[in-house]
């Protein structure tokens, strides 16, 4: 059975669909700060998680790979790490430097919860054609 660290590393290294299969049927991917941008902050189940990750991998940051991966906490059922992307956005055309912090909770060899924190200003630069300006104009 995979540990939380092994699951987190496989998520970091995997394609959108490969990463989605690591989640339990009732597993969730949370990016709570995306709510500040008006974006859904929680995705449940491998299918919904896969759809969101496909958007990230294919549209928002086509071909991205995580770099500078560091795992700071490693227990059988929890892992915490940071990982970075330097990628041109397929939406805005901007080069985005984004660091993620992820807390992975594992149960029965699957990801039960992966909660990620990120820089919402960098996310807005990649997610919207006019960056944070589009978020401000919506309010």
What is the predicted function of each stretch?
Residues 57-139:
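A beta-strand edge to alpha-helix "cap/lid" segment located at domain peripheries
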């Amino acid at each position: 059975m995979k540990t939380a660290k092994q699951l987190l590393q496989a998520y970091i290294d995997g394609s959108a669909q490969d990463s989605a299969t690591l989640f339990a049927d009732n597993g969730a991917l949370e990016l709570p700060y995306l709510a500040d941008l008006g974006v859904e902050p929680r995705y449940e189940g491998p299918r919904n998680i896969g759809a969101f990750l496909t958007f990230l991998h294919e549209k928002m940051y086509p071909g991205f790979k995580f770099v500078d991966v560091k795992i700071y906490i490693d227990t059988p059922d929890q892992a915490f790490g940071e990982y970075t992307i330097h990628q041109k956005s397929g939406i805005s055309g901007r080069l985005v430097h984004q660091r993620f912090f992820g807390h992975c909770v594992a149960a029965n060899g699957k990801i039960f919860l992966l909660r990620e924190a990120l820089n919402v200003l960098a996310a807005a630069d990649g997610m919207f054609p006019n960056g944070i300006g589009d978020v401000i104009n919506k309010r």
